[in-house]
């Protein structure tokens, strides 16, 4: 079992993967359990991206390559843009409909 050394902190690859899987499972549970609130759905999707980024960093550090960090940088940039656009859409929907409950927003009204 290899250990990742980060500034005098030694984390094994197994522990990192368990953490990443736990983040991913929590985000999937958030999506499945709470389908009504659009903000919780957006946060769960961002948590999923965080789990994927953690995997990239773990495997890049394990193989001692910098490409994982580069991928994480670009994914974080895209995720930030996605979050900004998603929150802008949520604010626009809330201003027009006065709710963010997805069960009340499923009708196509003008």
Curated annotation (Swiss-Prot):
GO BP annotations listed: ATP synthesis coupled electron transport
Class of this enzyme: translocase
TM ranges: 13-33, 38-58, 70-90
Coiled coil regions in record: none
Molecular function terms, GO-annotated: NADH:ubiquinone reductase (non-electrogenic) activity; quinone binding
GO cellular component terms given for this protein: NADH dehydrogenase complex; plasma membrane
Entry-linked InterPro entries: NADH_UbQ_OxRdtase_chain4L/K, NUOK/Mnh_C1-like
Keywords: Cell inner membrane, Cell membrane, Membrane, NAD, Quinone, Translocase, Transmembrane, Transmembrane helix, Transport, Ubiquinone
Entry membrane topology: Multi-pass membrane protein
Catalytic activity: a quinone + NADH + 5 H(+)(in) = a quinol + NAD(+) + 4 H(+)(out)
The EC number(s) this enzyme carries: 7.1.1.-
Subcellular location: Cell inner membrane
Purpose of the protein: NDH-1 shuttles electrons from NADH, via FMN and iron-sulfur (Fe-S) centers, to quinones in the respiratory chain. The immediate electron acceptor for the enzyme in this species is believed to be ubiquinone. Couples the redox reaction to proton translocation (for every two electrons transferred, four hydrogen ions are translocated across the cytoplasmic membrane), and thus conserves the redox energy in a proton gradient.
NCBIfam families: PRK05715.1-2, PRK05715.1-3, PRK05715.1-5
Family to which the UniProt record says this protein belongs: Belongs to the complex I subunit 4L family.
Subunit (UniProt): NDH-1 is composed of 14 different subunits. Subunits NuoA, H, J, K, L, M, N constitute the membrane sector of the complex.
Protein known as: NADH-quinone oxidoreductase subunit K
Species in which this protein is naturally found: Francisella tularensis subsp. holarctica (strain FTNF002-00 / FTA)
């Amino acid at each position: 079992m290899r250990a990742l050394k980060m500034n005098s902190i030694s984390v094994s690859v197994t522990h990192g993967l368990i953490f990443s899987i736990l983040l991913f499972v929590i985000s999937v549970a958030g999506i499945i359990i709470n389908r009504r609130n659009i903000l919780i759905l957006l946060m769960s999707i961002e948590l999923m991206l965080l789990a994927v980024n953690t995997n990239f960093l773990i495997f890049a550090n394990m193989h001692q390559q910098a490409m994982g960090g580069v991928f994480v940088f670009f994914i974080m940039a895209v995720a930030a843009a996605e979050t900004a656009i998603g929150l802008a859409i949520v604010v626009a929907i809330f201003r027009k409909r006065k709710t963010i409950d997805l069960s009340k927003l499923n009708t196509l009204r003008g």
